[in-house]
Amino acid sequence: MKKTSKKNNNFKIPGTELNSADAERGKEESQRNFVELLPLEVTYKIFSQLDIQSLCRASRTCTGWNCAIRNNDSLWKPHCLTIRAVCQREIDDDIKSGYTWRVILLRNYQKSKVKYEWLSGRYSNIRSPVNLPEKAMCPMDADTWGEILDAELEREVEKLQ
């Protein structure tokens, strides 16, 4: 008489447990991670539609997404060119220095926001440092302050006319 064995669906390896539920969960996780499933060109096209904050959040989602986003400089270039409208000199200097688009964005993003607020006159009528919002300051060189003061002067001249 032949011995028949029952098939064990819960095959155990020390430290791990593999069963049909684990396999199904792994399959679902893989299906949700489009970075691993789609061609890189398609993945980059999807990521290129994200704004700066969403792109940064996506890069923190998992290691695979972080690598895909961090290592593709073309995802960061359009955002750098957008802030270049406010920080042209700074962006151009960083390009000449050979920084990657991602590093250029990291170096200039906060400065561009602060500089834009100053240039647009948001802080024109501040009477005391206490009235400045927390993020109204960042290191700026003399040329940047010169641009801001020129913009203030132009606003004052317009008021007088």
Curated annotation (Swiss-Prot):
Residues of the region (Disordered) are: 1-25
Q: Which InterPro entries match?
A: F-box-like_dom_sf, F-box_dom
List each copy of the F-box domain by range: 32-79
Q: Mind telling me what this protein is named?
A: F-box only protein 48
- Species annotation: Mus musculus (Mouse)
Q: What are the leading ranks of the lineage?
A: Eukaryota, Metazoa, Chordata, Craniata, Vertebrata
Query: Gene symbol?
Result: Fbxo48
